[in-house]
């Protein structure tokens, strides 16, 4: 049931080695690190996971390893979106086979597909997922697909759709979606507005920075449930100070560097054409890693 998918879900990074190959050992450590820090689930193979610079077989390997390592301890959502419907269907079938709890797909991008073509794309993936709920992934800043509110309302009511990952800064639209669909599982996508997203109606979030400080986001959820707005705001501010630094360094490579200093990821590199972190930021990232490890205890 999609209702079981509510919570704080880390958008999992994909570690690579010096030769740009998948680093399976680091991936396993990262899964365990997230489990140990109290994350509710993992969103695997999305933007943060650098899915679009991986081959289809690599993406399937990542799904298999994560499913094997998580062993039913947390919820697992497989992002299977590709421009190609057939490739998306192949990944969806793999997610079902590996025991994932849901699939997700970004709107098909690059080509100017019609909205009906978008709907057909999702219907085909849902069919291949064989009963797994679909999490529609709306991220207009990266996909270039700017869905209207009416189009979002149509997509989330397709048979088989159980959730929406709303990676948009439009909190008014977030509230409108919640008002229209009170039972929809709704994820906030931008980490820097997590608390605001919850207040606008989100059930939880899917975010990249949860990989290094997921307990802070769980703290925001707890504070808001208790009506403690001041604590929620304080925690969001602390998260945003980290995000300010990561925006300067490049978010994915910055996160991997922090995780490297935490002894979770062996090599802090993203796949090319992404480059490495500028060395001038390394002292700040190392200090951040030490701070977070002390805070976590």
UniProtKB/Swiss-Prot annotation:
**What's a GO cellular component annotated to this UniProt protein?**
cytosol
Reaction catalysed by this enzyme = aceneuramate = aldehydo-N-acetyl-D-mannosamine + pyruvate
Do you know which InterPro entries this protein is assigned to? Aldolase_TIM, DapA-like, NanA, Schiff_base-form_aldolases_AS, Schiff_base-form_aldolases_CS
Q: Which residues are the active-site ones? A: 137 (proton donor), 165 (schiff-base intermediate with substrate)
Q: Does the keyword DNA-binding apply?
A: no
GO:BP terms for this protein?
Answer: carbohydrate metabolic process; N-acetylneuraminate catabolic process
**What EC numbers are recorded for this enzyme?**
4.1.3.3
Residues annotated as binding aceneuramate are: 47-48, 167, 189, 191-192, 208
User: What's the top EC group for this one?
Assistant: lyase
Pathway listed for it is: Amino-sugar metabolism; N-acetylneuraminate degradation; D-fructose 6-phosphate from N-acetylneuraminate: step 1/5
Q: Where in the cell is it found?
A: Cytoplasm
Q: Name one GO molecular function term.
A: N-acetylneuraminate lyase activity
The record's keywords, sorted A to Z, are: Carbohydrate metabolism, Cytoplasm, Lyase, Schiff base
Q: Which domain of life is it from?
A: Bacteria
Q: Which PANTHER family match?
A: N-ACETYLNEURAMINATE LYASE
Give the record's subunit note: Homotetramer.
Q: Which family does it belong to?
A: Belongs to the DapA family. NanA subfamily.
Q: What does this protein do?
A: Catalyzes the reversible aldol cleavage of N-acetylneuraminic acid (sialic acid; Neu5Ac) to form pyruvate and N-acetylmannosamine (ManNAc) via a Schiff base intermediate.
Q: What is this protein called?
A: N-acetylneuraminate lyase
Give the species. Escherichia coli (strain SE11)
Q: Which gene encodes it?
A: nanA
């Amino acid at each position: 049931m999609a209702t079981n998918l509510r919570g704080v879900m880390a958008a999992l990074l994909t570690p690579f080695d010096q030769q740009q190959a998948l680093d399976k050992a680091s991936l396993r450590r990262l899964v365990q690190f997230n489990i140990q820090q109290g994350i509710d689930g993992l969103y695997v193979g999305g933007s943060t996971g650098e899915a679009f610079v991986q081959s289809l077989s690599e993406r399937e390997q990542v799904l298999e390893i994560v499913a094997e390592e998580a062993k039913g301890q947390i919820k697992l959502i497989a992002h299977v979106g590709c421009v190609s419907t057939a490739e998306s269907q192949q990944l969806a079938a793999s997610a079902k086979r590996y025991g994932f709890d849901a699939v997700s797909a970004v709107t098909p991008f690059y080509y100017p597909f019609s909205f009906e073509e978008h709907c057909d794309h999702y219907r085909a993936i849902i069919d291949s997922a064989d009963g797994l709920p679909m999490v529609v992934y709306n991220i207009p800043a990266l996909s270039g697909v700017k869905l209207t509110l009416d189009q979002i309302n149509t997509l989330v009511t397709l048979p088989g759709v159980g959730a929406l990952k709303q990676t948009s800064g439009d909190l008014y639209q977030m509230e409108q979606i919640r008002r229209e669909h009170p039972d929809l599982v709704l994820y906030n996508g931008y980490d820097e507005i997590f608390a605001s997203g919850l207040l606008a109606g989100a059930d939880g979030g899917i975010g990249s920075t949860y990989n290094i400080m997921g307990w802070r986001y769980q703290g925001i959820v707890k504070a808001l449930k208790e009506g403690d707005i001041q604590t929620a705001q304080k925690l969001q501010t602390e998260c945003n100070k980290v995000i300010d630094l990561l925006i300067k360094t490049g978010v994915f490579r910055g996160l991997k560097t922090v995780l490297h200093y935490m002894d979770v990821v062996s090599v802090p590199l993203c796949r090319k054409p992404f480059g490495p972190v500028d060395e001038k930021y390394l002292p700040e990232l190392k200090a951040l890693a030490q701070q977070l490890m002390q805070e976590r205890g």
